């Protein structure tokens, strides 16, 4: 029956695409009708439509066949049929890039452009500008100037929009039309004024002073076009973000005044601009929030949606500013548009008090099954934020999330819930068992491999430390029996972690691992064999190295290094220290909840891997070993100065490479042979400088300085460098960018650059700190006590220590429990050269904070460095 229905439907043509089965060769054959006399407009229109359809579907036209069809089409200009003529303009625009000698229609288009038929003039201008190149533009310049100030709005708008496109081809010619564009900007037509403002801005956007003057002029004289007002607000907002005046600027006053405009579009644009300004206080946000509050009760769904979506964004940073809208948002919970209702309730979750959480969760439960997965993810995001804000409400959240987890839904939705539950488990120790129980139940019927492996990893990490770890073994071993290879392998790893940390469970785990050795998959068998052999040794140090604490190196970096090792066989064993460290351990990274993810995630090279590759390509850096760590960029110039310079410190075992990213902001200068000369304050030795060959206006360039670390005193890791940028200046024409032949040497003093102890240490997470502590041993252990007299709270002390040392807090020890007078902070890292470094800091609060620091490493130097730096 279904097949019969489909056939009938296809024959009747109802709902089908008449161009679905077009063949290019047949259409080009039909195009010969263009040469017939007299011209048949109706048939020609149909064929042109087919050609446009094929072009827009991505059909490839060869140059010869496209040119033949184009030349045949030019004969259609002999017809006076308006629809056919306008279809010709469209076809010219589409075929301009694939046909040869398209300029043959220039005279016909120029004639239409300057003719008396207004209906032809606008489209003719757009088509003409599409086929015109830089050499021909001057020939039509006079006509373009006239068209820009034409009284017919469609002609003027066409000329202005075409001018915007022509800027890419010949900016200097279009710049001569600025007077006409200014005249068009005073037009009464809203679209002409909008397009004219766009042209004026793009002609001046590289000159901040000219943009400021333009804004000044239009903010004082006012505009008639609401579209132009929106553009003006965006320009003002962009300028505000770049200047230091901020909210004291007249530009901010202008944006605020637009909140009182008669057009809703302008009011919303102004409110959105204020909300997205950086460093906006709650007081400055208040007028914008008030306007959005009014929009919440608008009869137009689009306005209500825009308002609640924007308030949702405000609530992320300034929840207190949105509190005044809570009543309006509660009214929107019952909105017929489920998207609006969802955004309203998620906003309320961010702004509501702890007492309102239960009521809001009940309201969400009533309609959550009716909304799309995309908005369910938004709800989960809001719940996740709420868990961090009100940790005592985790039981309510957990119940709600577990119910959502049982409902039908796609991968992204399920992943968002799993990530949220994992976050609650990690942040609230008292919710651990309930969360793990819900996740165990979920993996019993989970069709997503990624989620199953993630949950198994969490069970292996958190399960062994629960009061009754044995209850999780059944759920994990079920995965070995029932699931695919990837999940079975993850389950084997989780079982090994239970055996490594629970002596009473070890015999049972060994039996289960022996069963896994009979698996059909290589990966599962190899893991089982490996873990079985490690566990049979019954050594805590081995367990810590090979089971608890995974690889701390970059996975893409390791893959590349191993591939290189196989290409160049060597008698030496592969050195793991030749691989860059991972910026953050794989198991520490929390997956961000995203609204859309269409492709499977590919492990992309990290920032560290990219730097490693860039530096390895420079001959001077070939023999200094693998990259250990790259710092965050440090700015060495003030904003609004002639040159913008920032530095990234690349640490190697015995060297530092300073990478200077330089930008020349002067359009009348070309800088050449740019270097940064560094004068160290201590026993650092500057070895070489690698210049940036040239720095044209606004184009970034990179220069490097190579420095050797002190040999005589390994603990002298901190230092200060005075920096001076030296270069050759060649003056140039700001308009053309052509430089003078002669240049002169000049220099520019930069801010001093500091190297601190944190630059020499890479963060690394140890999931089981106690095991790692025992693994390192006490051979080079040292302990000292310090008084932090200026520190008043334990939280402040913890944050200062973490920031100063640049190490990774373990066991969630960076969170200080409430109403405690003592706390233990556990830090882990790797010191330059690849040495494990562990710090245990016991803090006690009295008049100030007293700190007992114990440091362990397998080498003496890292221990001495930490104690010397803290002291």
UniProtKB/Swiss-Prot annotation:
Q: Which domain of life is it from?
A: Eukaryota
Q: Print the keywords alphabetically.
A: Cytoplasm, Cytoplasmic vesicle, ER-Golgi transport, Golgi apparatus, Membrane, Phosphoprotein, Protein transport, Repeat, Transport
Biased composition regions of type Basic and acidic residues, renumbered to the chain: 1-11
Looking up Gene3D superfamilies in the UniProt record yields:
Coatomer, gamma subunit, appendage domain, Leucine-rich Repeat Variant, TATA-Binding Protein
Specify where it is mainly localized. Answer: cytoplasm
GO BP terms in the entry: endoplasmic reticulum to Golgi vesicle-mediated transport; intra-Golgi vesicle-mediated transport; intracellular protein transport; organelle transport along microtubule; protein secretion; retrograde vesicle-mediated transport, Golgi to endoplasmic reticulum
Q: Where is this chain's protein located in or outside the cell?
A: Cytoplasm, Cytosol; Golgi apparatus membrane; Cytoplasmic vesicle, COPI-coated vesicle membrane
Name of the featured protein: Coatomer subunit gamma-2
Report the sequence similarity comment from the record. Belongs to the COPG family.
SUPFAM superfamilies linked to this entry: ARM repeat, Clathrin adaptor appendage domain, Subdomain of clathrin and coatomer appendage domain
Keyword tRNA-binding in the entry? The reply is no
Q: Which Cys residues form disulphide pairs?
A: none
Under the subunit heading, UniProt states: Oligomeric complex. Binds to CDC42. Interacts with JAGN1. Interacts with TMED10 (via cytoplasmic domain).
- Topology class, membrane: Peripheral membrane protein
Q: Cite a GO CC annotation.
A: endoplasmic reticulum-Golgi intermediate compartment
Chain segments carrying region Disordered: 1-21
What the protein does comes down to: The coatomer is a cytosolic protein complex that binds to dilysine motifs and reversibly associates with Golgi non-clathrin-coated vesicles, which further mediate biosynthetic protein transport from the ER, via the Golgi up to the trans Golgi network. Coatomer complex is required for budding from Golgi membranes, and is essential for the retrograde Golgi-to-ER transport of dilysine-tagged proteins.
Q: Which InterPro entries match?
A: ARM-like (IPR011989), ARM-type_fold (IPR016024), Clathrin/coatomer_adapt-like_N (IPR002553), Clathrin_app_Ig-like_sf (IPR013041), Coatomer/calthrin_app_sub_C (IPR009028), Coatomer_g_Cpla (IPR032154), Coatomer_gsu (IPR017106), Coatomer_gsu_app_Ig-like_dom (IPR013040)
Residue windows of the HEAT repeats:
64-101, 283-320, 321-355, 356-392, 395-430, 467-504
Phosphothreonine, modified sites: 594
């Amino acid at each position: 029956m279904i097949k019969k229905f489909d056939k009938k439907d296809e024959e009747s043509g109802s709902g089908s695409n008449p161009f679905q089965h077009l063949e290019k060769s047949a259409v080009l054959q039909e195009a010969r009708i263009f040469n017939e006399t007299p011209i048949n407009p109706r048939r020609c229109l149909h064929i042109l439509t087919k050609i446009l359809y094929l072009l827009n579907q991505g059909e490839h036209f060869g140059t010869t066949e496209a040119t033949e069809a184009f030349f045949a089409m030019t004969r259609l200009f002999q017809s006076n049929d308006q629809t056919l003529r306008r279809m010709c303009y469209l076809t010219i625009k589409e075929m301009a890039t694939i046909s040869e000698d398209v300029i043959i229609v220039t005279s016909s288009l120029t004639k239409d452009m300057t003719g008396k038929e207004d209906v032809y003039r606008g489209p003719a201008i757009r088509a003409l500008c599409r086929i015109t190149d830089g050499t021909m533009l001057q020939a039509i310049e006079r006509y373009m100037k006239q068209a820009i100030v034409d009284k017919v709005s469609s002609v003027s708008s066409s000329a202005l929009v075409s001018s915007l496109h022509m800027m890419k081809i010949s900016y200097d010619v279009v710049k001569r039309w600025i007077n006409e564009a200014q005249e068009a900007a005073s037009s009464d037509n809203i679209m002409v004024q909008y397009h004219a403002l766009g042209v004026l801005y793009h002609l001046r956007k590289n000159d901040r002073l000219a943009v400021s003057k333009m804004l000044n002029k239009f903010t004082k004289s006012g505009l008639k076009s609401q579209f132009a007002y929106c553009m003006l607000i965006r320009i003002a907002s962009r300028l505000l973000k770049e200047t230091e005046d901020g909210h004291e600027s007249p530009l901010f006053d202008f944006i605020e005044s637009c909140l009182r405009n008669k057009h809703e579009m302008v009011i919303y644009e102004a409110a959105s601009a204020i909300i997205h300004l950086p460093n906006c206080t709650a007081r400055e946000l208040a007028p914008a929030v008030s306007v959005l509050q009014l929009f919440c009760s608008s009869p137009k769904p689009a306005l209500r949606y825009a308002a609640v979506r924007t308030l949702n964004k405000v609530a992320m940073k300034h929840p207190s500013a949105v509190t005044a809208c809570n009543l309006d948002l509660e009214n929107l919970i019952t909105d017929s548009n489920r998207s609006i209702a969802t955004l309203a309730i998620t906003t309320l979750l961010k702004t509501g008090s702890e007492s309102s959480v239960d009521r809001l969760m009940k309201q969400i439960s009533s309609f959550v099954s009716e909304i799309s997965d995309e908005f369910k993810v938004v709800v989960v995001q809001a719940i996740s934020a709420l868990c961090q804000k009100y940790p005592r409400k985790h039981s309510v959240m957990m119940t709600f999330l577990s119910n959502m987890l049982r409902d039908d839904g796609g991968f992204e939705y399920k992943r968002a819930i799993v990530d949220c539950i994992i976050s609650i488990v990690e942040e609230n120790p008292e919710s651990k068992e309930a969360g793990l129980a819900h996740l165990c139940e979920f993996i019993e019927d989970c069709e997503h491999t990624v989620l199953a492996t993630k949950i198994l990893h969490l069970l292996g990490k958190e399960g062994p430390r629960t009061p009754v770890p044995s209850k999780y073994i059944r759920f994990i071993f079920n995965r070995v029996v029932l699931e695919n290879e990837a999940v079975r392998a993850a389950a084997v790893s989780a079982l090994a972690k239970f055996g490594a940390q629970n002596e009473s469970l070890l015999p049972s785990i060994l039996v289960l691992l022996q069963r896994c050795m009979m698996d059909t998959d290589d990966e599962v068998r190899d893991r089982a064999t490996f873990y079985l052999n490690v566990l049979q040794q019954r050594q805590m140090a081995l367990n810590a190295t090979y089971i608890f604490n995974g690889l701390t190196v970059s996975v893409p970096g390791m893959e590349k290094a191993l591939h290189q090792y196989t290409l160049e066989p060597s008698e030496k064993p592969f050195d793991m220290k030749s691989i860059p460290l991972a910026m953050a351990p794989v198991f520490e990274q929390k997956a961000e909840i995203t609204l859309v993810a269409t492709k499977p995630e590919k492990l992309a090279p990290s920032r560290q891997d990219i730097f490693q590759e860039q530096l390895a390509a420079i001959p001077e850096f070939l023999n200094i070993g693998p990259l250990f760590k790259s710092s965050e960029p440090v700015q060495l110039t003030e904003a609004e100065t002639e040159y913008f310079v920032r530095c990234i410190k690349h640490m190697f075992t015995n060297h530092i490479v300073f990478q200077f990213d330089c930008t020349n902001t002067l359009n009348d200068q070309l800088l050449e042979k740019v270097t940064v000369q560094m004068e160290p304050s201590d026993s650092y030795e500057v070895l070489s400088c690698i210049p940036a060959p040239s720095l044209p206006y606004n184009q970034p360039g990179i220069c490097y300085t190579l420095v050797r670390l002190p040999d005589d005193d390994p603990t002298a890791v901190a230092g200060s460098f005075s920096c001076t940028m030296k270069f050759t200046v060649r003056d140039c024409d700001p308009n053309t960018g052509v430089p003078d032949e002669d240049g002169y040497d000049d220099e520019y003093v930069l801010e001093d650059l500091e190297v601190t102890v944190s630059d020499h240490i890479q963060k690394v997470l140890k999931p089981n700190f106690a095991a790692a502590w025992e693994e390192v041993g006490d051979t080079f252990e040292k302990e000292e006590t310090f008084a932090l007299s200026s520190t008043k709270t334990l939280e402040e002390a913890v944050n200062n220590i973490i920031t100063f040392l640049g190490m990774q807090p373990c066991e969630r020890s960076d969170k200080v429990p409430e109403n405690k007078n003592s706390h233990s902070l556990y830090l882990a890292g790797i010191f330059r050269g690849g040495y494990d470094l562990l710090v245990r800091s016991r803090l006690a609060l009295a008049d100030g904070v007293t700190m007992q620091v114990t440091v362990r490493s397998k080498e003496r130097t890292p221990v001495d460095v930490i104690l010397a730096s803290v002291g």
